[in-house]
Curated annotation (Swiss-Prot):
Organism encoding this protein: Mus musculus (Mouse)
Residue ranges constituting the EF-hand domain according to the UniProt record: 8-44, 50-85
Keyword ATP-binding: no
UniProt PTM comment: Phosphorylation at Thr-5 significantly suppresses homodimerization and promotes association with NCL/nucleolin which induces nuclear translocation.
Predominant subcellular localization, coarse grouping: cytoplasm
InterPro entries per UniProt: EF-hand-dom_pair (IPR011992), EF_Hand_1_Ca_BS (IPR018247), EF_hand_dom (IPR002048), S100/CaBP7/8-like_CS (IPR001751), S100_Ca-bd_sub (IPR013787), S100A11 (IPR028482)
Assembly and interaction partners: Homodimer; disulfide-linked.
UniProt-recorded name of the protein: Protein S100-A11
Keywords from the named record: Acetylation, Calcium, Cytoplasm, Disulfide bond, Metal-binding, Nucleus, Phosphoprotein, Repeat
Phosphothreonine sites (modified residues): T5
Modified residues (N6-acetyllysine): K22
Subcellular location: Cytoplasm; Nucleus
CDD domains: S-100A11 (cd05023)
Annotated residues for binding of Ca(2+) 1: N26, Q28, E33
Length: 98
């Protein structure tokens, strides 16, 4: 039986595979696939953005090899960054309660 961490890793892989490949290459997210992922899986984050260009800038910043697509490692950089931001927010909130 997989551990909680192993299940999380499996879920990340499954989500990446769910969105990649619709435009042809199943090892990368195209810009369209990235936008679909963001608007579906991270809808609360996307809806709270006041700047309509934020997703385009995120894609460019995450696309380290500048090929116009996100591979799995670049995708994980997004997930890691969001996890760090959420963790920091959680820590700040819990410290205010003390």
């Amino acid at each position: 039986m997989p551990t909680e961490t192993e299940r999380c890793i499996e879920s990340l892989i499954a989500v990446f595979q769910k969105y990649s490949g619709k435009d042809g290459n199943n090892t990368q997210l195209s810009k369209t696939e990235f936008l679909s992922f963001m608007n579906t899986e991270l809808a609360a984050f996307t809806k709270n953005q006041k700047d309509p260009g934020v997703l385009d800038r995120m894609m460019k910043k995450l696309d380290l090899n500048c090929d116009g697509q996100l591979d799995f490692q670049e995708f994980l950089n997004l997930i890691g960054g969001l996890a760090i931001a959420c963790h920091d927010s959680f820590i700040q909130t819990s410290q205010k309660r003390i």
